[in-house]
Amino acid sequence: MVRWLTAGESHGPALTGIVEGLPAGIPVTTQDVQDALARRRLGYGRGARMKFEQDAVTILGGVRHGRTLGSPVAIQVGNTEWPKWEKVMAADPVPAEELDGLARNAALTRPRPGHADLTGMQKYGFDEARPLLERASARETAARVALGTVARAFLGELGVRIVSHTVAFGEAALPESHPFPVPEDEARLDADPVRCLDPQTSAAMVAEVDDAHRAGETLGGVVEVLVYSVPIGLGSHVHWDRRLDARLAGALMGIQAIKGVQVGDGFATAARRGSAAHDGIARGADGRPRRTSDRAGGIEAGMSTGGLLRVSAAMKPIATVPRALPTVDVATGVETTAHHQRSDVAAVPAAGIVAEAMVALVLADAMLEKFGGDSVAETRRNLEAFRAAVPALPEPGADVVEDGPMGDPLP
């Protein structure tokens, strides 16, 4: 079983992530993680923090000379702004006189609607929001992207490749007829300000962000993750928590600000008749069954079909709105407006990078659950043996009725 945890606060000294259960022999370097974190900082609508956030990466354990050891991998992502926050976010007690007058230490008693502030204060008994927003911040996703880099490298060794793109930004949306991106498109996607390959749609998305910025608003959108060469049979139909789609949905919903997830055509499928909702089965060129479309997103009954795996995540507008929303000051009881922390207008393109990481972690777990292996080489052998054992369809005889009725299986 692959397990992962992160620790750390937004303005603390560092974020730390640990992933356990991955096999030995995965190629990964500090630079690989650094490059993945640089991709997380991409995207039109990001705030000033992205310009000076450096994400100083240190691999603390589980890797030697660029290969995983099979032991837990620990990665630290240092906060280059830590000296400015050293007293405010110190783990040990700080004398009150050293904190007095520090603007960064001001009590945040006007909770922001849509954030963890108010509910977290009520749940944990805090009298201000700082202890909540530090951990609830999407800065935590840097640690998840770091861990996802290792999982993604493992999948790459097995021929499984991941790509994501932005399909909607505010009211601007990619036409449904637009072809899916492939992994080779990653550099082109990352070079686009909103990570959308269609120039006309990309320009419309940029305009949406500009309009929101001028209006003192924030903006949400939808990202889609596509996974190529996923083998048949990841996940299971037998229990709810073993279903691959449920595991992916939970991982994506666990990303900050994600409010909806769909697999394949998802909600659009609900509006179709049954004959137009499902993927037909045909004889493939290799003699094995194949799907004639990908409406299900490569997952049926909780199991991967071997087709293109597609999942989408809807991100709400960032809750720290420059045009501050109405709230109540919990220290005075006065109705007022929410405090404003430095934030982005939008972070939808970055959400695609985080979603890639979460999908990679879930699929790495599912691959090892299905194929096992203490080393990459062993997992690869098991996968290749399974794929070779998937039977081809029999050659139809001349006397076989092409569309003969089978009768009702449940008379």
UniProtKB/Swiss-Prot annotation:
Bias (Basic and acidic residues): 285-294
Required cofactor names? FMNH2
Q: Cite a single GO BP annotation.
A: amino acid biosynthetic process
Annotated region (Disordered), positions in chain: 278-299
* Gene Ontology cellular-component annotations: cytosol
Which positions bind FMN? 135-137, 256-257, 301, 316-320, 342
Q: Which PROSITE patterns match?
A: CHORISMATE_SYNTHASE_1 (PS00787), CHORISMATE_SYNTHASE_2 (PS00788), CHORISMATE_SYNTHASE_3 (PS00789)
Q: Which InterPro entries match?
A: Chorismate_synth, Chorismate_synth_AroC_sf, Chorismate_synthase_CS
Alphabetized GO MF terms:
chorismate synthase activity; FMN binding
Positions of NADP(+) binding: 40, 46
Q: How is the cofactor bound?
A: Reduced FMN (FMNH(2)).
Q: What is its EC number?
A: 4.2.3.5
Q: In which pathway does it act?
A: Metabolic intermediate biosynthesis; chorismate biosynthesis; chorismate from D-erythrose 4-phosphate and phosphoenolpyruvate: step 7/7
Q: Which reaction does it catalyse?
A: 5-O-(1-carboxyvinyl)-3-phosphoshikimate = chorismate + phosphate
List the keywords (alphabetical).
Amino-acid biosynthesis, Aromatic amino acid biosynthesis, FAD, Flavoprotein, FMN, Lyase, NADP
Say which domain of life the source belongs to.
Answer: Bacteria
- The top EC class, named as a word, is lyase
Q: Assembly and interactions?
A: Homotetramer.
Family (UniProt)? Belongs to the chorismate synthase family.
What functional role does this protein have? This reaction introduces a second double bond into the aromatic ring system.
Protein name, UniProt field: Chorismate synthase
Organism in which the protein naturally occurs: Micrococcus luteus (strain ATCC 4698 / DSM 20030 / JCM 1464 / CCM 169 / CCUG 5858 / IAM 1056 / NBRC 3333 / NCIMB 9278 / NCTC 2665 / VKM Ac-2230)
Gene that this sequence comes from: aroC
